[in-house]
């Protein structure tokens, strides 16, 4: 399974070998992981990454591939807005709408269905 840091860097257009921004990106990833924890996604005790050794299966070992891809997209969008926000307000608004939809869908996915 791919490293969380490496895959988010790839989505941001940063080569895995380029480590100059790793501390900033890790901080933003951890902030988003905290938000996901509050939504009920991931380990109940929370989860942080410190380097490129933490993988997606460490964070969400039991998620379906579809849920995992939504989690990756959500983390990317949030980190993109924190680390390298677009200049256009319409693009920012589009990102925020996508983020809101992912939050709703991830919350529904982890909320137990009534019996």
Predicted segment positions?
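Conserved short "hinge" loops at termini or chain/domain junctions
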Residues: 1-67, 103-115
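Short loop/turn elements at secondary-structure junctions
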Residues: 59-115
């Amino acid at each position: 399974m791919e490293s969380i840091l490496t895959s988010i860097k790839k989505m941001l257009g940063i080569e895995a070998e380029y480590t100059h921004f790793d501390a900033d990106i890790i901080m933003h990833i951890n902030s988003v992981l905290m938000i996901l924890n509050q939504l009920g996604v991931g380990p109940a005790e929370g989860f942080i990454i410190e380097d490129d050794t933490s993988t997606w299966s460490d964070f969400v070992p039991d998620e379906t591939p579809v849920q995992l891809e939504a989690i990756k997209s959500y983390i990317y969008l949030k980190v993109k807005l924190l680390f390298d926000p677009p200049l256009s307000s319409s693009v920012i608004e589009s990102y925020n709408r996508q983020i809101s939809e992912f939050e709703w869908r991830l919350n529904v996915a982890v909320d137990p269905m009534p019996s």
